[in-house]
Swiss-Prot record:
Protein species of origin: Mycobacterium tuberculosis (strain CDC 1551 / Oshkosh)
Occurrences of domain GP-PDE (ranges): 34-303
Span of the signal peptide: 1-25
Name this polypeptide is given: Uncharacterized protein MT2337
Keyword Thylakoid included in the entry's annotation: no
Keywords assigned: Signal
Length: 304
C-alpha cells in the first residue's frame, strides 16, 4: 500500500529515501537487543498463522508472536489473514461464512511455497487453521502476543477476542493492533484489552517529525506503536499549474523519532518489515524496542 503526502518541503522527504546500506559499519550499541517478533508466526518459513509456524518460531527463539485474527460464523476467533479463504487454503469465501468446524477442515498450508523449491510441500501434510485459543496454548506463558485484527464489522471480532483472552488469562500479555481505525476504536472501548496506537496516528507523528520536527500528535503513554523500517511513499507537491510527484523509500524511524515517541513514559515502538541483519542493526542503533520479521529462522542468526 502506498501513502500520498501533500507537501511543499519535498527535499526533506527525499533526504530520508534509500535503502539502508550501512549495517556492516553499525555498532550494536550498549542497549538491549530489540525483541524479535514473528510476523504471522513466521510467514516465510512455514504456513502462516498455524500451530506449526508458532512452534517453530518459538524453537527459533523469538521474543514475541504476531498473529492475524478473524472470527468464524459461530463467533470463534481463528488465525487467518486474507479476506478470501482461497488465497491460502483449499477452501473459498470469507472466514465469517464458515463455522469453526468447517474452517478447521481446511488446509492453511495449501498454497504455501518455499523460496527456491518447486511445488506445494504442505498439500500432503495438512496444517489446519487454528483457533486463537489453540494458538495461545502453543506459546510460552510469558511470551508477548500481538493480535492483528483483520475483519469488519469490528464488534463481533473484538468481543470474541476479548472473551478468549479473559478465559485463557492471556489479556495481560496481549496487544491488540489493527490497520483499520474502526477496529482500533472498538478495541479501545472494550474492557480488558491492551490496544496499540492507531496506525493513522503513528504515521502522522512520524511524518510530522520528518518534515517539520514537531512531535505531534502527542504520544500516548503505555501504548505500542509500529511502522515499517523502510516504506515506499509518494510525495506530491501542488503548484498553480499542476503538481510534482516523487517516489521515495522513506526511513521514518530514526533516533529523533524514537525519542519523540518515548517522550511520554512507557510508550514502546516496533519496526515492521525487518528483513536483514542490516535492518536489525539499524533498529538496534536507533533504539527500537522490537522488530517484526517474516523469517525467525534467519533472524535467530542476527544476534550473534
Amino acid at each position: 500500500m502506498v501513502k500520498t503526502a501533500m507537501l511543499g518541503a519535498v527535499a526533506l522527504v527525499i533526504a530520508l529515501g534509500g535503502t539502508c546500506g550501512v549495517a556492516d559499519a553499525l555498532p550494536l550499541g550498549q542497549t538491549d537487543d530489540p525483541m524479535i517478533v514473528a510476523h504471522r508466526a513466521g510467514t516465510r518459513d512455514f504456513p502462516e498463522n498455524t500451530v506449526l509456524a508458532i512452534t517453530n518460531a518459538v524453537a527459533a527463539g523469538v521474543d514475541g508472536m504476531w498473529l492475524t485474527v478473524q472470527v468464524s460464523s459461530d463467533g470463534v476467533p481463528v488465525l487467518y489473514r486474507p479476506s478470501d479463504l482461497a488465497t491460502l487454503t483449499d477452501g473459498a469465501g470469507p472466514v465469517n461464512s464458515k463455522t469453526v468446524q468447517q474452517l478447521q477442515q481446511l488446509n492453511a498450508g495449501w498454497n504455501f511455497t518455499t523460496p527456491g523449491v518447486e511445488g506445494h510441500p504442505y498439500r500432503q501434510r495438512a496444517t489446519p487453521i487454528p483457533t486463537l485459543e489453540q494458538a495461545i496454548g502453543a506459546t510460552p506463558p510469558d511470551m508477548t502476543l500481538f493480535l492483528d485484527l483483520k475483519q469488519t464489522p469490528p464488534q463481533p471480532l473484538v468481543s470474541a477476542v476479548a472473551q478468549v483472552l479473559t478465559r485463557t488469562g492471556a489479556a495481560g500479555r496481549s496487544i491488540v493492533y489493527s490497520t483499520n481505525a474502526d477496529i482500533t476504536a472498538a478495541a479501545s472501548r472494550q474492557e480488558g484489552l491492551q490496544v496499540a496506537e492507531s496506525r493513522d496516528v503513528t504515521r502522522q507523528r512520524l511524518f510530522n517529525m520528518a518534515l517539520n520536527h514537531h512531535c505531534d500528535p502527542q504520544p500516548d503513554p503505555g501504548k505500542w506503536a509500529g511502522f515499517e523500517l523502510h516504506r515506499d511513499v509518494t510525495v506530491t507537491e501542488e503548484f498553480t499549474l499542476g503538481s510534482g510527484i516523487s517516489a521515495v523509500n522513506a526511513e521514518l524511524w530514526d533516533e529523533a523519532s524514537v525519542d519523540c515517541f518515548r517522550s511520554q513514559s512507557g510508550m514502546k515502538v516496533m519496526g515492521f518489515a525487518v528483513k536483514t541483519v542490516d535492518d536489525y542493526r539499524l533498529a538496534h542503533k536507533i533504539g527500537l524496542d522490537a522488530v517484526l520479521v517474516d523469517s525467525p529462522l534467519a533472524a535467530q542468526q542476527w544476534r550473534h
